[in-house]
């Protein structure tokens, strides 16, 4: 699993980003988690450039807080121009306390509490990603009490099997996350959201799963999501501007 920031000296000493890991272990103890800031920044820039090249200047890749949620990581993401998604008030607090711009934060999760909703609204975050009818109604109430209009995306399930590990497959029709396109539940949720005066529905989000190694999964997802956006326009007269395709690129956990 050696990558271009991991090497061995002629004496057989393992190095990471140019540092002798045995010396780091002596200085900081073990277990010790090492991250290469230069590599992280380079990856951010790669994604940002690819998005600009293929999706235009209005596109934005998001860093998933579940990967590593601590202040320095959020500072790096802020400096590199990334967005972030969070799934708890704790992650939101950490991002904000690191100075991450609230308008580039997306609050995900299918079990948000009233306290989560109130905290996010009070901090002026960019988007809530609403998962179900109950959340929509609760968020409408919270936004009305705060006298604000909150931007949202709706999470829907496209019915895609990414052929990954079952526990991290999230886009199938029977997923616990989001409303299914296939059953009509997603359209019902869209129509409800459009009636709520303190919610500004901007688009849709879906997440097909983690450990996705093939780009064909995203093409199949687009083949469902784009026609669904068209059907929303046909049935409601509203053109939604945002399409957020979620999913985790595969990581080599074994050699």
Q: What is the meaning of each model-derived region?
A:
Residues 3, 159-255:
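Active-site loop/helix belt of alpha/beta enzymes
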Residues 1-151, 187, 191, 196, ...:
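A charged N-terminal "starter" segment
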Residues 149-161:
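Glycine-rich, aromatic-flanked loop segments that form ligand/cofactor-binding clefts
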Residues 38, 87, 133, 157-159, ...:
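Anionic group-transfer/hydrolysis microenvironments
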């Amino acid at each position: 699993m050696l990558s271009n920031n991991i090497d061995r000296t002629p004496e057989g000493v393992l190095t990471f980003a140019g540092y002798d890991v045995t010396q780091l272990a002596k200085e900081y103890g073990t277990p010790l988690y090492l991250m290469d800031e230069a590599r992280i920044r380079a990856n951010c820039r790669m994604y940002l450039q690819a998005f600009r090249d293929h999706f235009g200047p209005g596109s934005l890749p998001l860093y998933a807080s579940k990967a590593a949620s601590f202040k320095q990581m959020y500072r790096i993401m802020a400096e590199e121009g990334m967005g972030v998604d969070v799934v708890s008030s704790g992650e939101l607090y950490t991002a904000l306390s690191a100075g991450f711009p609230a308008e580039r934060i997306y609050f995900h999760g299918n079990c948000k509490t009233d306290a989560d909703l109130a905290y996010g609204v009070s901090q002026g975050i960019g988007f809530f990603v609403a998962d179900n009818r109950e959340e929509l109604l609760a968020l409408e109430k919270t936004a009305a009490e705060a006298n604000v209009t909150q931007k949202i995306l709706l999470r829907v399930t496209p019915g895609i099997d990414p052929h990954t590990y079952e526990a991290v497959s999230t886009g199938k029709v029977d997923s616990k996350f989001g409303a299914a396109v296939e059953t009509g539940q997603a359209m019902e949720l869209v129509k409800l959201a459009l009636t709520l005066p303190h919610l500004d529905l901007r688009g849709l989000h879906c997440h097909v799963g983690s450990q996705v190694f093939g780009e064909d999964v995203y093409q199949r997802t687009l083949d469902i999501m784009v026609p669904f956006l068209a059907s929303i326009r046909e049935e409601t007269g509203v053109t939604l501007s945002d399409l957020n395709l979620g999913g985790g690129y595969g990581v080599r956990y074994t050699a």
